[in-house]
């Protein structure tokens, strides 16, 4: 009997591998991996299926990732886009503890491992959406996967042949999922309150004060329909910025939802709102008076105050409740919002509930952006050097509402002089960017992944609750770089850790705090991306005290939605060599080191944007020859940030030129996502179209149209900037590099301008808005500057240009990432969406929109196809099929899933071909 089963399984896998073109897989080793994982090795896919799996995985399949994919961006150039989506819940254990589900984000794949003692054996892989960041088990035969870039959730069935049964379209950039309710039959999914799949969304909501930007999609998992959205019970909007983490109470009756970048009750006053001089030093080291700039203030519970406690409350036109974590009644007929908790942290990563007492624990960082200046602090008396943000775990007691933040690095002497190092024994206690967390079964230990420290810390729960936590390196477990996902078995003796930088899963012996085995995952990323990633996150490398990194502000390569006053009073003015827009006045002859507040800019999409920083003070003039070619201006400019490792992060010395080159190679690959405000067919509404016409053609300034400065030439890679400097008008005293405009929709949420005569606007969800310092609350207020000459009626034309800018073109078209699952008898709305995907994929001018990939697993056989220009489908393994022939493969329970992937990536993804 067993021999017959083995032969049957071998035959199935032979068919699968023949159709799928074979390939590499996840290797097994006994030691932790380095930051760059070794080449993956083929899985032992022909070993017998464990009888204990019963009807599950009877026909394991290998669709993607560590099982069959072989090509990378090195062997198939230009076949990968690096989105740097942050993992949220990348691991899930099956309810019987026998399987581990792993999201392989760069491979767009769910990987299923059998737990065999202290090792992991790959038994199946299922192709899901783009950038899967979370997975949760709904039942023994079903898991749901959250696809961050596809704005979707893949419902994966495991009975018989693992396959995607449904694709649920949800809001923009979903991040987390849990199943709650007394029977755990309701799915809760966090996403941004925007996007073309969000019912009722229009760009008008982006200019409406007091509108929440966070959605929780709620489903009865047993009552899905075949519409695009799958018939959610409700979509609950939270009064916060976009959400990330979810957690459930021990009885399943409450779901906790956390805002991601929730802020910290800081805001910035416009320079025109300052009726007294700013406190502190106002000259450079060479004695030049600083330009007039704004001021960051923080609400202390009673008033808005600056660093010397001046009260600026009369200048702030709104309140910031700073609501971070929300409780949701998961059992109500229509789930409702309950208690809210403030003061949890600035950037909230993950949450877990203690199984012993029901307390909620939240990993977070607390930004210190109200502290002025970088550098030594000698002339300025203050500096954030080495202490940009505190890594914390915050304890919430639901019964009382008590919120107790616990700083994890209280052992560090942050007053050490610039260039000094702390003893190795002290540095080894540091933990940076805590993300995933999981409790021991008895609730006495909280295992916390320190993404920036390559460690998992076993924190005593009682010490966190009491606030008496004492850092102790003996409680740390060294793991591969970038730990971001944790799961623990029922007995509490084995911990499973997913590390994003190393792209590996390890099995940890909890008692000995040692790694027992390592499973390397396949990644299609280039060696340059894999090797350079650590320089963004690695706090041990980046800072002398091991607590901060570039990712402390540039969270997952993006931004933190805060402003910082990172001038350096110890420095002198420097000559501004940058090129200016023709006819623009040139008033900033020299860059002043006291630049004033500036909002964090994204690291995504930097190629082709010219000098860096808001002022362009990373000029890129010293361009080197690298690998036989003169580097780009942007590459040279990025390397000028090396000094920040010392002056800002607090490292003893800059990193080496080779390390900075590796960091640069990685950073230049980071990409912007599609704009979710734009219609999926890339069309414009009547208002957006009118705004585009004004933007491109009307002389809104004396220098010309908006496009004259903010150049929009998608075919040339220009999305709002031509890389030149310009005079900004009389209200701004410094000249600035013209910035790109692709992410304006992410900056909405502050209403109330400190420098106008308007009244108080009420509670808002964020304290920073538009312009270089975030002081302008809305684009409409930005366009009210006297430098702009809008045609009458000005209110209407400003509104039109605002609508267009919020729907601005991006590198990738709106359809990229979008999916639909089709089965015979599909509804009209499914057919319509599939027709849209096909039409967009066959649009080649003025530039290619996307590649359309089709995937199915039917009776144990994997089918993977790429749409051709003539409408036929190229099949993985060879041959062509007509559209009718491809659809003829699908059945009601074994459907086809179609995905629009970035142009140029389809051959690698669908066919494993360059």
Predicted regions and their residues:
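Short, conserved, GDST-rich strand-edge loop motifs in beta-rich repeat architectures
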Residues: 190-211, 258-319, 362-390
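A short helix->beta-strand "capping" segment at the edge of beta-propeller domains
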Residues: 53-88, 120, 231, 335-337, ...
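Asp-box/WD-like beta-propeller blade repeats and closely related beta-sheet repeat scaffolds
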Residues: 162-181, 190-195, 200-215, 228-248, ...
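Bacterial Sec-dependent N-terminal signal peptides
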Residues: 17-68
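Blade-loop segments of beta-propeller domains
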Residues: 119-140, 148, 174-176
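Periplasmic c-type cytochrome electron-transfer domains
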Residues: 163, 180, 248, 256-263, ...
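Beta-strand-rich domains and repeat architectures in extracellular enzymes and scaffolds
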Residues: 76-111, 320, 432-441
């Amino acid at each position: 009997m067993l021999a017959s089963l083995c032969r049957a399984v071998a035959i199935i896998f032979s068919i699968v591998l023949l159709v799928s073109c074979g390939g590499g897989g996840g290797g097994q080793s006994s030691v932790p991996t380095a930051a760059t994982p070794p080449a993956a090795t083929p899985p032992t896919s022909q070993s017998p299926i464990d009888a204990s799996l019963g009807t599950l995985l009877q026909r394991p399949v290998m669709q993607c990732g560590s099982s069959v994919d072989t090509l990378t961006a090195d062997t198939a150039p230009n076949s990968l886009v690096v989105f740097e989506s942050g993992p949220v819940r990348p691991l899930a254990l099956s309810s019987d503890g026998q399987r581990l589900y792993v999201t392989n984000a760069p491979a767009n794949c769910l990987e299923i491992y059998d737990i065999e003692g202290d090792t992991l054996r790959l038994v199946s892989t299922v192709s899901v959406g783009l950038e899967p960041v979370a997975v949760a088990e709904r039942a023994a035969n079903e898991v749901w996967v959250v696809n961050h870039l596809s704005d979707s959730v893949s419902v994966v069935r495991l009975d018989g042949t693992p396959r995607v049964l449904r694709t649920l379209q949800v809001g923009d950039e979903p991040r987390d999922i849990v199943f709650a309710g007394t029977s755990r039959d309701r799915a809760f999914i966090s996403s941004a309150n925007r996007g073309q799949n969000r019912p009722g969304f229009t760009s008008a909501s982006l200019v409406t004060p007091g509108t929440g930007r966070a959605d929780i999609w709620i489903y009865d998992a047993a009552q899905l329909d075949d519409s695009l959205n799958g018939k959610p019970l409700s979509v609950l909007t939270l009064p916060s910025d976009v959400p990330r983490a979810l957690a459930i109470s021990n009885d399943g009756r409450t779901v906790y939802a956390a805002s991601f970048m929730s802020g910290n009750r800081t805001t910035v006053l416009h320079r025109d709102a300052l009726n007294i001089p700013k406190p502190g030093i106002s000259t450079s080291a060479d004695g030049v008076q600083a330009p007039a700039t704004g001021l960051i203030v923080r609400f202390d519970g009673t008033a808005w105050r600056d660093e010397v406690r001046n009260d600026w409350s009369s200048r702030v036109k709104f309140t910031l409740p700073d609501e971070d974590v929300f409780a949701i009644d998961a059992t109500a007929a229509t789930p409702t919002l309950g208690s809210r908790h403030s003061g949890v942290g600035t950037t909230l990563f993950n949450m877990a509930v203690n199984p012993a007492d029901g307390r909620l624990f939240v990993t977070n960082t607390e930004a210190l952006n109200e502290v002025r200046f970088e550098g030594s602090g000698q002339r300025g008396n203050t500096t954030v050097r080495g202490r940009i943000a505190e890594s914390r775990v915050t304890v919430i007691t639901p019964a009382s509402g008590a919120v107790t933040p616990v700083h994890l690095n209280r052992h560090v002497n942050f007053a050490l002089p610039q260039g000094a190092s702390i003893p190795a024994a002290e540095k080894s206690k540091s933990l940076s960017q805590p993300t995933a967390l999981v409790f021991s079964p008895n609730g006495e230990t909280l295992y916390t992944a320190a993404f920036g420290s390559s460690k998992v810390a076993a924190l005593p729960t009682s010490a966190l609750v009491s606030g008496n936590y004492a850092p102790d390196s003996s409680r740390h477990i060294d793991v591969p770089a970038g730990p971001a996902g944790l799961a623990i078995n029922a007995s509490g003796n084995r911990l499973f850790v997913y590390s994003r930088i190393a792209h590996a899963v390890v099995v940890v012996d909890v008692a000995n705090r040692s790694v027992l085995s390592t499973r390397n995952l396949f990644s299609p990323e280039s060696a340059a991306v894999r090797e350079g990633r650590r320089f963004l996150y690695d706090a041990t490398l980046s800072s002398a005290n091991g607590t901060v990194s570039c990712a402390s502000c540039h969270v997952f390569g993006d931004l933190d939605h805060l402003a910082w006053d990172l001038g350096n009073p110890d420095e002198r003015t420097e000559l501004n060599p940058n090129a200016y827009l023709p006819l623009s006045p040139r008033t900033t002859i020299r860059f002043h080191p006291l630049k004033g507040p500036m909002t964090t800019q994204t690291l995504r999409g930097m190629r082709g944007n010219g000098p860096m920083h808001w002022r362009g003070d990373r000029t890129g003039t010293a361009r080197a020859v690298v690998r036989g070619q003169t580097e780009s201006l942007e590459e040279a400019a990025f390397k000028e940030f090396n000094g920040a490792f010392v002056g800002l992060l607090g490292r003893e010395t800059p990193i080496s030129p080779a390390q900075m080159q590796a960091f640069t190679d990685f950073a230049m690959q980071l990409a912007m996502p599609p704009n979710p405000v734009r219609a999926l067919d890339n069309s414009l509404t009547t208002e957006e179209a009118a705004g585009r016409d004004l933007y491109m053609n009307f002389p809104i300034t004396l220098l010309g149209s908006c496009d004259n400065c903010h150049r929009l030439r998608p075919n040339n890679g220009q999305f709002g900037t031509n890389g030149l400097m310009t005079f900004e008008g009389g209200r701004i005293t410094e000249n600035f590099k013209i910035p790109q405009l692709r992410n304006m929709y992410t900056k909405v949420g502050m209403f109330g301008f400190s420098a106008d005569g308007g009244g108080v606007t009420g509670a808002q969800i964020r304290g920073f808005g538009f312009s270089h310092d975030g002081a302008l609350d809305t684009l409409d207020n930005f366009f009210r500057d006297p430098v702009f000459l809008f045609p009458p009626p000005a209110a209407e034309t400003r509104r039109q240009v605002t609508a267009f800018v919020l729907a601005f073109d991006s590198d990738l078209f709106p359809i990229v990432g979008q999916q639909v699952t089709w089965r015979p008898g599909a509804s009209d709305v499914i057919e319509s969406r599939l027709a849209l995907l096909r039409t967009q994929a066959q649009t080649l001018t003025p530039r290619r929109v996307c590649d359309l990939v089709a995937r199915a697993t039917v009776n144990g056989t994997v089918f993977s196809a790429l749409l051709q220009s003539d409408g036929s489908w190229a099949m993985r393994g060879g041959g062509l099929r007509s559209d009718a022939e491809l659809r003829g493969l699908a059945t009601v329970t074994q459907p086809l899933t179609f995905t629009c992937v970035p142009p140029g990536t389809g051959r690698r993804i669908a066919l494993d071909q360059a």
